[in-house]
């Protein structure tokens, strides 16, 4: 079969392919996409072209306006991959009211150039003023802020916005008010040390870091499953243990910086909206670039949110009004650090190096337990009360007793680890500044450039290979029998626990029969 003759595609046609794929209730196969495109646009496509269009490097198409979308690829500049990345950078920076000057564009172009594999053996272009003017005409959106223009938040406007948000919140029952936030978590952080970092193709990133997305309602009665974003598509520790994230009650995503991106946030919002099926809920978010871009993509699509109303907190208000940004994230990290400290102490007692034996699967297990088991609804409810989001409710001051208790417990464990020989600020261990840095222009460049990093097989290169015995159904049944025997021999056995074990035993026995 002769190869397909290359046909120039407009950005609008590429955008249509992405829209049809990502907004379809049932994701079409690439062959189905090719047939659909030929039927609607009378052009033939190669499968490799479809794969490229659906990849993250073409995310910028989702926000492209109608006028610019008629530009054909062969009318782009000499370096289309770079220009697509620059459009992505520009969109993210504008969301933060950042000043996009000509010098900023040229500087970011040079930074991105060094990180794009296709250009690795080519000299860096001059990026002259002539190139800049042509690039602006070709690609930049109308309404671009140039020459240092940026918007600032007026205090009066800020207070008016909060009054309007409080009025909106008052229309919802507390059980239908949700807050979502993400936080970095350096899962091998050692007391009195900074997170270990590495430099990969010009990008500096923490070695053992994930981003954890947490979401809960105001009463604490509902905690959504965690979303964890790492570096590897399928970490080696997961494969060795044959661990399946869905079975563990969490969702795993990945990218080159282990941070929230527009595409992951858009996926999360649609997942959350499906989770709220049959309800009308309010979702409170902070004004983070990925949040805003994702919501804008959804609002401009045919498949909009049905069950969820989204409201953004004013800029620079998260320290005051953000429940998850206050004690909820702090408590979550405190619970996690407790498991990690206990693990370190035990490994050292056994003569092992915890930094080598630790892996991301163990970390995720502790995250899930911290969130699903250790977290009491009262902690979350009190955090919402302390936030001042509710009308006629003065924000409470000072940490809650539970948060203080967790910190005291951690301080005792740290004393055992350090041997009380060092002065130690516990805040630097529970919630280090490196995990919560704001997005600077360098951060945004890193996030855009991350799409060009090679896929990883592991989360850190320090992990020792760990042999895992794959359990059979018979092994699981035997383990349940052991637990049932333990319950029978306990004077204070838990009847509800016994019933749960019997139900699980029945399910496993039905599997073994099949």
UniProtKB/Swiss-Prot annotation:
Species for this entry: Schizosaccharomyces pombe (strain 972 / ATCC 24843)
Keywords: Centromere, Chromosome, DNA-binding, Nucleus
Residue ranges of domain HTH CENPB-type in the record: 70-145
Official protein name in the record: CENP-B homolog protein 2
Annotated compartments: Nucleus; Chromosome, Centromere
Task of the protein: Binds to the central core and core-associated repeat regions of centromeric heterochromatin.
One Pfam assignment: HTH_ABP1_N
Domain (DDE-1) ranges: 172-384
GO molecular function, one term: DNA binding
Residues making up the signal peptide according to the UniProt record: none
Domain of life: Eukaryota
GO cellular component: chromosome, centromeric region; nucleus
First-listed, main subcellular location of the protein, grouped into a coarse class: nucleus
């Amino acid at each position: 079969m002769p190869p397909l003759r290359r046909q120039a595609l407009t950005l609008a046609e590429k955008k249509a392919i992405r829209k049809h794929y990502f907004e379809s209730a049932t994701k079409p196969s690439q062959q189905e996409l090719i047939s659909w495109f030929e039927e609607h646009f009378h052009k033939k496509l190669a499968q490799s072209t479809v794969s490229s269009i659906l990849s993250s490097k073409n995310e910028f198409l989702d926000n492209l306006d109608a006028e610019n979308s008629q530009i054909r690829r062969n009318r782009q500049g000499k370096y289309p991959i770079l220009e697509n990345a620059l459009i992505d950078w520009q969109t993210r920076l504008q969301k933060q009211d950042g000043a996009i000057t000509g010098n900023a564009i040229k500087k970011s172009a040079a930074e991105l150039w060094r990180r794009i594999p296709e250009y690795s053996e080519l000299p860096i272009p001059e990026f002259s003023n002539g190139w800049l003017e042509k690039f602006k005409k070709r690609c930049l959106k109308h309404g671009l802020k140039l020459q240092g223009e940026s918007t600032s938040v007026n205090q009066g406007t800020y207070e008016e916005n909060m009054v309007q948000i409080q009025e909106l919140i008052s229309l919802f029952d507390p059980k239908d008010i949700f807050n979502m936030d993400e936080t970095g978590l350096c899962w091998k952080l050692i007391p009195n040390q900074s997170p270990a970092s590495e430099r990969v193709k010009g990008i500096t990133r923490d070695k053992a870091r994930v981003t954890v997305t947490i979401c809960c309602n105001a009463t604490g009665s509902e905690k959504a499953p965690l979303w964890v974003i790492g570096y590897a598509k399928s970490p080696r520790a997961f494969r060795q243990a044959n661990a399946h994230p869905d079975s563990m009650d969490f969702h795993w995503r990945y990218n080159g910086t282990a941070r929230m991106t527009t595409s992951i946030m858009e996926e999360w919002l649609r997942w959350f909206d499906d989770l709220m099926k049959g309800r009308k809920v309010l979702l409170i978010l902070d004004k983070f670039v990925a949040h805003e871009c994702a919501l804008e993509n959804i609002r401009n699509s045919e498949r909009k949110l049905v069950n969820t109303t989204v409201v953004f907190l004013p800029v620079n208000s998260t320290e005051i009004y953000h429940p998850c940004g206050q004690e909820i994230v702090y408590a979550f990290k405190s619970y996690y650090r407790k498991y990690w400290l206990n693990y370190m102490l035990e490994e050292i007692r056994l003569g092992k190096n915890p930094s080598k034996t630790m892996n991301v699967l163990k970390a995720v297990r502790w995250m899930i337990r911290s969130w699903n088991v250790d977290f009491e609804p009262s902690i979350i409810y009190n955090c919402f009360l302390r936030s001042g989001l509710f009308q006629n409710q003065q924000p409470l001051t000072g940490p809650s007793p539970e948060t203080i208790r967790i910190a005291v417990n951690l301080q005792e464990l740290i004393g055992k680890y350090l041997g009380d020989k060092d002065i130690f600020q516990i805040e630097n261990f529970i919630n280090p500044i490196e995990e919560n840095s704001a997005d600077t222009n360098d951060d945004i460049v890193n996030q855009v450039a991350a799409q060009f990093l090679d896929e990883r097989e592991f989360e850190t290169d320090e992990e020792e290979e760990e042999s895992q015995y794959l359990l059979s159904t018979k092994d699981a049944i035997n383990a349940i029998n052991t637990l049932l025997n333990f319950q029978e021999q306990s004077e204070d056995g838990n009847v509800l626990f016994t019933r749960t074990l019997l139900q699980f035993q029945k399910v496993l026995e039905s599997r073994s029969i099949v």
